[in-house]
Amino acid sequence: MTKTITRVALIVVACFVLCGASLAAPRSAGVTEPPVFAFYPQAGIAWADLYFGNFVDLDPGPGVLDWSCGSQTYDGHSGEDSLVRSFREKRIGVPVFAALDGAVVQVQSGLPDEHVEKTMTQVDNHVIIASLGGHVRTVYGHLRRKPFVRVGQRVRAGQQIGWTASSGHSSWPHLHFTAKFDFQVYEPFAGACRTGQSYWREQPPLPAAPYAREFTFSPQPFGGRRDPPWDTAVRTGTFTRGTRDVYFRIELGFFGGSPMQVTFTRPDGSIAFDGVEATRLRGGRATWASWHERLDLDQLGTWRLRLAAKGRELADAPFDVDRPGKRRNRPPNPVSLSLDPADPTGADVVQCLVRTSLVTEDPDYDVVRYRYRWRVGAKLVRDVTSAALSDVLRHGVARPGRRLSCTVTPSDGKRRGPSAAVSVSVR
């Protein structure tokens, strides 16, 4: 087996040189502690298509300490870094939302948004919102060139304010989210080293085991990093019968670097290859690895590649072997939906969550985008296409007694998969 291993150093740094237009917000009395956030202000699902690369550094000295007593941060880091899976998703679009009602007090825009190298002098595109009479400020950093809001504008929780990008001091598309109470940074996550109340309505737990965030096959070698201009390898789920080079790549979260069990199975269930490969990857950060195997693809039909570590299956990836000239583009696989909260009131921010396999979103392993269409009764109130596995409808749009629905259609950019829908009566 020929093997290429790459570690993505996703220690993505947030650096805010707070410049651009600004507006002071009036202060009010009576607010004694930070509010609880109803949702994370970025489209996607935590520890699925969103990966938290860094939390707030709670160590006042030169060391590092995150809320779980781990080291998922760096010295002086002032917020949460939530990463999307690639620059391809960034270009499709991953929305960023206001976490609370408030007033926009600062906007920086118009700067390049696909940085892959970190330079301390680089300023990012960002938005700052003041809430609760100015006691709370939320910062949304590394955005695309053109945020959706302007200084002085009033916004509601769940309102889209921009798109995820990699502007400023950044090496990967992500949102840097900072929460401040009375101008002091605080950590919304609660745990062993940040005791007390969590400031998330539903705090996502840390993964208990490694998991696959993305997977693809290719008939060609992969390049190095997956940032612009990207490797030129063709994503595929179909190979031609014969002796072929099969390249495959997996992105992993919370992987500890243990040996990887690699097994190729023919359509009749027989084993074409079974081996253990060292990975040399270290845990804590998102990492990705690619290998290739020269296989005798001697049977037509659906083959499977299974990757496992420490007895845990990380990927079960099917691919087809066909006759020459039979390669085709297939639509994305079906998805299922849920709403959060499941029984919303008119005052709730509502999320539409997509459930799908992170390995087999698409049978050809294409990057999938999702069209979200929200309706209140028959009226279309939001229509957006993004690469994220969730979308958000701001509070106040759905009135009590009305029917709220979310319809999602997956697409690979050429073919649409089957639409899914979910609906509920608003209390």
Where on the chain are the PLM-derived regions?
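Solvent-exposed serine/threonine-rich low-complexity stretches and specific carbohydrate-binding patches
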Residues: 272-283, 382-388
